[in-house]
Amino acid sequence: MKMSEQLSDRYNPADVESRTYEWWEKNGYFKAQDQSTKPPFSIILPPPNVTGFLHMGHALDHTIQDMMIRWKRMNGYNTMWLPGTDHAGIATQSVVERELKKDGVTRHDLGREKFVEKVWDWKHQYGNRIYGQMRRLGDSCDWDRAVFTLDEGVSKAVRKVFVSLHKKGLIYRGQRLVNWSGPLETAISDLEVEHKQIKGSLYHVKYPLEDGSGFLVVATTRPETMLGDSAVCVHPEDERYKHLIGKNVLLPLTNRKIKIIADTYVDKEFGSGVVKITPAHDFNDYKIGKTHNLEFINILTKKAEINENGGVYAGLKVQEARKRILEDLKAQDLLEKEEPHVHSVGHCSRSGAVVEPYLSEQWFVKMEALAVPAKRVAENGTIRFEPESWTKVYLHWLNNIEDWCISRQLWWGHRIPVWYCEDCNHQTVAETDVTACEKCGSTKLHQDDDVLDTWFSSALWPFSTMGWPNETETLKTFYPTSYLVTGHDIIFFWVARMIMMGLEFQRDVPFRTVYIHGLVRDSQGRKMSKSLGNSIDPVEMIEKHGADALRFTFAAHLYSGKDFKFSEQRLEGYRNFMNKVWNAARFALSNLSDFKAPTEGVKALPNKVHISVFDQWIITKLEEVTKTVEEAMEQERFSDASTALYQFIWNQFCDWYIEFTKPILNGNNAEEKAATQLVIAQVLNRIMRLLHPFAPFISEEIYQKLPIKGTACIVDQYPNARNDKEFLSLGSAQAALEIDIVKEVITAIRNIRGENRISPAVKLNVRLGVTNDQTQKILGNNRTALMTMGRLENMEIGPEGDMMKCAVAPVVVKDASVKVIIPLEGLVDFDEEVKRINKSIEKLTRDIGMLSGKLSNEKFVANADEEVVAADRALLAQSKVQLDSLRDALTRFQ
């Protein structure tokens, strides 16, 4: 990498990021080796849609994966992060159809072959733009291995799996109820159904009894579907209707006879306790229809309009039919009442139209047999979910699994490998294109028009991306993969199906660990969406604040499986952290200009005779944070790891250590200065390596400027206490205690200055009240640091003495106790201070009363978020301490 002699005055993320990423790629640091003596660690990237742009969910997902890959790479693993994109059948076809519509052309005008060519043209032009955005984030993928779900190799795998499952009787064609999008004229998956709360109506319709003795009232939100009713249903133990079970009612407006049946599915308490059963247009009714052997009457066309079974309403759109039917019911006095009703209605995420449960001929996978081994590997711990609570959710779904509809009425995707003979009607299922019927030899064949659900090819992703069905070295080395990172919304659509397919075709699980993260929400906790206008573009955030700041924001708020409230204000805070790191490195490097890099490099040790207590202290703190980060990363506690690093770098290294060492670096003791310079160089080296998985760009840039470094931070060893014993042994628990006492005393002095609004330019007189000889010695040994950093005129160490008209702050560090006493005579107006303190006491007393009342309310404690309750309790405790302190001050000032 082309490096300047020193770090620039200001940190410019855009300059550093583009240059650094290009250098990493050029040097092949992301590449995995199919054959290596290093232990393998692999992650398969959940393939984003080829139509997509990087969104906040991706950015979080990718940050977690890249942190793990970089951490494992630095720990000596042969890492492979394999990227890819999904052809996204419905999404991509919809995008291209919208483009054609601008020219007044439909896909049907073009025909299938030319339309698919258009989609490929679009894919070649726009399909890889998300890769560029992933690079902006810092994704260290092995780009040479990138795969597309319609690549030839994946297509080969898809066909092989289809044929194999079909031979085993696990794939079949049948008529079942599916989610149907009328505008798209295709079945869609549950994931493509968005449920919205709709303010509608509940219509109470009279169904006349066949014998003319009265009627039953049925409540429905969709009166138009009554055209497909096969029965009305009551609870078998409902005394109101027991005598009617087995009799008939006349379907309103048509007078078609339908039976009154009984089933425990019915809720006796809802509405009238009578429900209409429409097996061809409701998923619950479908099951009842199967149980009671009812007629399945489809009343919709593929465009979701009323078909010929709708009689006089045929040809109407659903909403038009509803309006007409309601008018006719009123005219015949068959509508008892209409009342407002809010209910959930499924909408197609692509077209926006209401999703219709629709009876159609589709291809399905039998899931029950495939689910058995998939349950076993979760139960016996072969696969681990993090957080563990998701294991129960996964198992619950598998225990209630239904067959999977895998066919879609689209043109873009993996076409179903089934050919129909026009002469003998035989079906040929094959891995390669068929030219003649395997039964009669006829060449009059046509391939099934449907394509496979996108999730079908995605289910094979962990092994199809590695070259299967060929026995490749990649497959031998990296399957099963080590880690899967994903959101909880696709556990069933993708994770479970990958596990099933991996066990079926590789006889092993596809991954060992499934890390489930929460959703990225806005600052108010709302889900990000276009309709709310609260979506945030991660690329825009990167351009404003830098990729490292965004990554660190995610890492610092990654609590096990919980949703994350994102705000730009938080991001700005971590941008400030990056600036802090940059400026600290600039200061340190400016004081290393005359430092001669030792030939031993990272193994070089300072002279123990000349090492300062401050050096010993920072090394002790470095050991602590190294152990904390290592343990947290091993347990996937990314927030704990990043927060510990943040606190060490900002608080210990930048705010304290650098300030402590300034007198040494500017002093005349050459031996002590040389020792401190070496410690600074070594600690900075380790900080950059510790920081790298979280903030790769800034850490690499600074690392390359260090006098002690390897080839590249990205491939240097990640710090751990076991391999760094010699350097870390220079730390000292006693030194750590000493400096912690000194820090707390300085902090107390600064707090008193701030609380009493005393200018930093005014040097203070301080008395440190202490009786313990050892503590007196510690304070005496660090007089220079206390005087300089406390901005003191004079400092006495000894008995407490008179504390009237003084500010007092107690300091306790382990067994050491110090009272910081600062005379305020001539520095503050005591009358004004007494007024201010009294006002503060009044306010705190009110606040404490409100908080106490809130926390004594059992309903609030039971229903509020745990974090809110904990925060209120902490605030109450803090407020009580502040109140005691103010009362003490009031006594001294009066």
From Swiss-Prot:
Alphabetical UniProt keywords: Aminoacyl-tRNA synthetase, ATP-binding, Coiled coil, Cytoplasm, Ligase, Nucleotide-binding, Protein biosynthesis
Record bears the keyword Metal-binding: no
Residue stretches in coiled coil: 827-852
GO molecular function, one term: valine-tRNA ligase activity
InterPro entries, A to Z: aa-tRNA-synth_I_CS (IPR001412), aa-tRNA-synth_Ia (IPR002300), Anticodon_Ia_Val (IPR033705), M/V/L/I-tRNA-synth_anticd-bd (IPR013155), Rossmann-like_a/b/a_fold (IPR014729), tRNA-bd_arm (IPR010978), tRNAsynth_Ia_anticodon-bd (IPR009080), Val-tRNA_synth_C_sf (IPR037118)
PROSITE patterns registered for this protein in UniProt: AA_TRNA_LIGASE_I (PS00178)
One Gene Ontology cellular component annotation held by this UniProt entry: cytosol
GO biological process: valyl-tRNA aminoacylation
Primary residence: cytoplasm
Enzyme Commission number: 6.1.1.9
Motif 'HIGH' region, chain ranges: 48-58
Enzyme class per UniProt: ligase
Keyword ATP-binding appears in the UniProt entry: yes
Catalytic activity: tRNA(Val) + L-valine + ATP = L-valyl-tRNA(Val) + AMP + diphosphate
Compartmental location: Cytoplasm
SUPFAM superfamilies assigned: Anticodon-binding domain of a subclass of class I aminoacyl-tRNA synthetases, Nucleotidylyl transferase, tRNA-binding arm, ValRS/IleRS/LeuRS editing domain
Positions annotated to bind ATP: K530
Motif ('KMSKS' region): 527-531
HAMAP family: Val_tRNA_synth_type1 (MF_02004)
Entry's free-text remark on domains: ValRS has two distinct active sites: one for aminoacylation and one for editing. The misactivated threonine is translocated from the active site to the editing site.
Complexes and interactors: Monomer.
Role summary: Catalyzes the attachment of valine to tRNA(Val). As ValRS can inadvertently accommodate and process structurally similar amino acids such as threonine, to avoid such errors, it has a 'posttransfer' editing activity that hydrolyzes mischarged Thr-tRNA(Val) in a tRNA-dependent manner.
Protein family membership: Belongs to the class-I aminoacyl-tRNA synthetase family. ValS type 1 subfamily.
Protein name, as recorded: Valine--tRNA ligase
Organism field: Bdellovibrio bacteriovorus (strain ATCC 15356 / DSM 50701 / NCIMB 9529 / HD100)
